[in-house]
Amino acid sequence: MSFTIAIIGRPNVGKSTLFNRLVGQKLALVDDKPGVTRDRREGQARLGDLDFTVIDTAGLDEGPRGSLTARMQEQTETAIAAADALMFVFDARAGLTPTDRSFADFARRANKPVVLVANKSEGRHGEAGALESYALGLGDPVGVSAEHGEGMSDLYDALRGVMPEPTEEAEEFDDDDIIESEDISQRPIRVAIVGRPNAGKSTLINYLLGEERLLTSPEAGTTRDSISVELNWQGRDFRIFDTAGLRRRSRIEEKLEKLSVADTLRAARFAEVVVLMMDAQNRFEEQDLRIADLIEREGRALVIAVNKWDLMGRQSSLIAALRTDADHLLPQVKGMPIVAVSGLMGEGVDRLMTAIQDAYAIWNRRVPTAALNRWFEQAVDANPPPAVSGRRLKLNYVTQAKARPPSFIVFCSRADAVPESYLRYLVNSLRGFFDLPGTPIRITLREKANPFAHKRKRKS
């Protein structure tokens, strides 16, 4: 029996992008302008072993009776009536709006299973918006990036909870198991190579490709655009983005260079692993730290490549000193891989490509629930949270909200009272316990509802 899911939400939250992702074709027009979708559109979707009909709807919005907006809403209401379940989509980067809250009530009144989808949830702003959506009372949000295909395995798990059991025994699926117009299981790892101008980014890519595909020059700023190339390295596919060097914004005067920096930032956001290239002769300058901080804030896995190693006499003691400096200067990505390379000579390139694949695997890591609970109990017992104003803070339990990067929610009695230092302790403890070097780890505190609070209020 066919199962139908309607994708609903306010205009311009990415409903059509998600629809195209699920059906594997660009059947729905996508544009940044709200209201591009006017009619409901149906397609056959497949996610892992789940087959279903999906309906793309116009954005839910109010309009005068008889107007085009009102007719669009009528089409949406018809789709909801025909559906067996709803996917309520909101823009996690923008956060919840009054319209989102209004139509969350609308979705509840439909009296059908609802899967809450936090689209555009990549990056720190997206994560905050996704967590904010718990206030809607529609259950746990599923963080996805419909544009980049992230979070599809989490969406699969959520849809399995509202759909009839598949006829065959279900398997576990990764994000790559969604069927697209091309076999996404072959999708390359997206890698951005960033750094200060003239660090040797293009030289490294030319070595990997075996040809002088990108212009190189001792003059800083030869690369103006973010350039994408595909690469197969020992049987694994990669898409590599070479970027213009990042300088301090205050020193940028040419309009062209301003655009280059913006392009570099976009490439870093689009990537899954970011390689920060540093010149071995000028390492860990202020701008390197700024770039690394940007990468961490965007939630990307980080690998440091120390280039022009051959010019430094290949001193092994220098790498040890770099590791110490990196852990001190960048504690938020402690243990990140540091690889000495010579892009010109090809030295260390095998180690770099292995480090990229390892970082990608860690970035995608999901921690088994039993092991997560065991770590949490040990960490809190070893170092309980400090009392605040004479009141003890109680940490109840922890759950993993998502991967890419690994993100966790700790439920506690008073979220606003837990010191930042204790949060850092939990992050470092978790990183060490589960061996998660070099990837951002997000731990968000959320207060556990007190079932007796309303009773106390009534007595007073």
From Swiss-Prot:
Record-listed GTP 1 binding positions: 9-16, 56-60, 119-122
InterPro entries, per database record: G_ENGA (IPR031166), GTP-bd (IPR006073), GTPase_Der (IPR016484), KH_dom-like (IPR032859), KH_dom-like_a/b (IPR015946), P-loop_NTPase (IPR027417), Small_GTP-bd (IPR005225)
Annotated GO MF terms: GTP binding
Keyword presence, GTP-binding: yes
The keyword Repeat is assigned to this record: yes
Binding residues annotated for GTP 2, in chain numbering: 195-202, 242-246, 307-310
GO terms for biological process, alphabetical: ribosome biogenesis
PROSITE patterns: G_ENGA
A Pfam family per the record: MMR_HSR1
Domain KH-like: start-end pairs: 365-449
Gene3D superfamilies on file: 3.30.300.20, P-loop containing nucleotide triphosphate hydrolases (3.40.50.300)
Keyword terms: GTP-binding, Nucleotide-binding, Repeat, Ribosome biogenesis
Residue intervals of the EngA-type G domain: 3-167, 189-364
Entry function: GTPase that plays an essential role in the late steps of ribosome biogenesis.
PANTHER family for the chain: GTPASE DER
Complex and partners: Associates with the 50S ribosomal subunit.
Cross-referenced NCBIfam families: GTPase_EngA, small_GTP
Record family assignment: Belongs to the TRAFAC class TrmE-Era-EngA-EngB-Septin-like GTPase superfamily. EngA (Der) GTPase family.
Identification of the protein by name: GTPase Der
The species this protein was found in: Nitrobacter hamburgensis (strain DSM 10229 / NCIMB 13809 / X14)
